[in-house]
Amino acid sequence: MIAKVDAEAENSKATAQDQGVSSYPTIKFFPKGSTEPEAYSGGRTEADLVSFMNGKAGTHRTPGGGLDAIAGTIEALDSLVQKFTGGSSIAEVAAEATKAAADLKSNAQNKYAQYYVKVFDKLSKSDNYAAKELARLDNILKKGGLAPEKLDEFTSKTNILKKFLEKATGKSEL
């Protein structure tokens, strides 16, 4: 959570004093579960603050609130995508992906790990699934009007699909 506190307000002066706020603006980061802050001394641009928060929270936001090109991707599963596009049997790699995704069951990445499994499954039935699905999602994104959660979901899915396609073509579009 990010909060702005008016340290001059009567009901906030005690908090400001407790936190050692003596000049403004003062930015402090409170790690989850901690009451001890870390002072922020980086740049004050939106890009600097977003970069700092991404590092602390493990997120992939860009200035403006969107997601970057690796949001949703999972390194362990990307290596399996590379193995598949390098010539390994889809059945073999899909089984490995299913096992790797199961290992992430309790992890926040589970939703997108399951999406990798789905893409492998669909590719076993249709070689051009990734390209078709990427085109479909790109069209939906271009139309706009999506709820923020759907925008994030579709952006993450397109990032994953691009991993399948960039490896197949041997180049990155990032």
Indicate where each model-derived feature is located:
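Proteins that catalyze or organize thiol-disulfide redox chemistry
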Residues: 1-174
